[in-house]
Amino acid sequence: MSFQQANKDNYQNKIDNLDSSQSQAVFADADNVVIKAPAGSGKTHTLLAAVANYRYEHLNDRICAITFTRAARQEMEVRLREMGIYDVEVTTIHVWARNLLEYFADKHDFRIQVLNETQIKQILQEIVRDYLVRARIRSVNINILYTYITGNKTMDITDNYRRTLRALEERYIMYKRNNNLYDFTDYPLYLWNIMEIYDEYVNTIDALFVDELQDVDPIQFKTFERVNTSKKFFIGDGWQSIYVFRGSDGEVFEKLDDFHLCKLKYNYRSYQEIIDYASTVYLTLYDKVVDNDISSYITRVSYSKESSIECQKGYGGQVAIITPYEECYVFKNGERAIDNAYRQLKRIMELNPMILCRTNKQVKEIQELGFTDVSTIHQAKGLEYDNVVVVDTEIDCLEDLNVAYVALTRAKDSMLVINFVQFENFLKSFKEVI
């Protein structure tokens, strides 16, 4: 079905519902546009409107939209179909890179060689044997190591074991580099190297739309620079860059000097108090984190006059912060009240909140207490919930701060931030009385 035959009512409705900052982004008179979209500002809505508008104005152009998860790809495809748009290539970064590799392999007559699972584990066995002797460690489970290096960085393991896996992963990456080998996680790197060897550019599309720009790593970014198109539209939020362990670069926005910059200004997810608190946490801790001043976003902000002032602006929302000293600060309707911590906790738990944790280990421990609405922060990225409990974790680096910001911006109506040990103890007593 062509766009001319599509359901243009849905398209027009999306365009009509754009706010002023979203409209400036969608209709920007520039070939290259980059959008800074804070949490809850309508990022997906804006991106879809931009894709639809470009399709409307360029009926025969080849359009590619890149996301970073299969779930996001599926959602975008569904929402485009609702507007009658069926001919936009919506793909993930790894699938896009693989498809281009196949195109260049056919063009230059070379064979794509990627390690399979058996070959990867054989290499890992060799690396582990050497490492065990040097590090004087008894054993490492190859299956766990394989799972770790292929993407599951939040599995339920001890900190010491995680450090061991990280060290082994670094050796595996170096082994691949030294032997010119690739596995399926390396498609973007493989593509870039091929483009360098053959001095290739991507000339197969007319417009490139990229979601979650903050999750792009330097190699992927350089690849996008070699895409020759009449339109590039990138959107994301540097404060939500939580995949540093994969090489993502939240500072990528600063590298787009030749792009027209737009900023989405309005929040449609959370009460203002929640947004103010999340922003205050980020801005208060940013310099400390950069200066390697380890901190907790509960204890540092709970006593902050700046935080209190910010949270008192706006009406209707509620933010509760539980400190390690069991003092509860509640900001509601512009007024601050001090309430008993456990009574406030009980009130929030009766709302069946989503509990967000930093690690799978924390998730598992809470689930074992009989609570099912619990998730890691990484799994909750891009989602929203009426009520949220955020389990506080130590912030050691900028990635930790970005993860904290993602967690603090998932709530629409109410949010509680609490130390994990305190919360676990409360859940045990709470379970006994319900």
What is each of the regions a protein language model found here?
Residues 106-177:
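ATP-hydrolysis module of ASCE/P-loop NTPase motor domains
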